[in-house]
Amino acid sequence: MKKSLSLVLASGSPRRKELLAQLGYDFDIVLPDIEEAKQADEQAQDYVLRLSLEKAQAGLALAKPDSVVLGSDTVVVCDDRVLEKPKSFEDSKRMLTDLSGRRHQVMTAVSVVSSEQQHSVVVTTDVWFKPLTHEEIEQYWQSGEPCDKAGSYGIQGLGGRFVTRIEGSYHAVVGLPLFETDQLIQEFL
């Protein structure tokens, strides 16, 4: 990496921090505060892309001059509905019931910005769930894992036992597609 540039992750997600570290980059972390609200007619892909870009741009305002800032967001889409982080057990139960025994999409957007340029990508992965019982959903909620996850599950944790198949990027489902993220960062080197 050029010595004049410093990489900054605009996220408090421990999963994104761990995944970015896997790419071998040194980076700092800033915690941008943006409103995550879907506009009424906004398509899922446009929404997740907008959020990743807003996070990166807000992070750029918090970072040192000459920083390169990475923002990312993930949503789960089922029947053209965006499933974000659950607000309650009832919300989580509804999401997991909707995903039960079906295919859905996980969309992760990554935006990398500097004061001179910006590059973004959206990675969509198809995920299939086994049929879930009410008991499995209740036990999973009790584990605490679904609380901070889009779609109310984490493929890298206990929620992985619900997944029968994926087509696409496993790392994108976790929160940061490694290949695509590295390609974006390379644009700034």
Swiss-Prot record:
GO terms for biological process: nucleotide metabolic process. It is an enzyme of class 3 (hydrolase). Its main location: cytoplasm. Pfam families: Maf. GO terms for cellular component: cytoplasm. GO terms for molecular function: dTTP diphosphatase activity; UTP diphosphatase activity. It comes from the Bacteria. Transmembrane segments: none annotated. The keyword ATP-binding does not apply. It catalyses: dTTP + H2O = dTMP + diphosphate + H(+); UTP + H2O = UMP + diphosphate + H(+). Keywords: Cytoplasm, Hydrolase, Nucleotide metabolism. It is found in: Cytoplasm. The active site is at 73 (proton acceptor). The record marks 15, 74, 156 as: Important for substrate specificity. Belongs to the Maf family. YhdE subfamily. HAMAP family: Maf. This is dTTP/UTP pyrophosphatase.
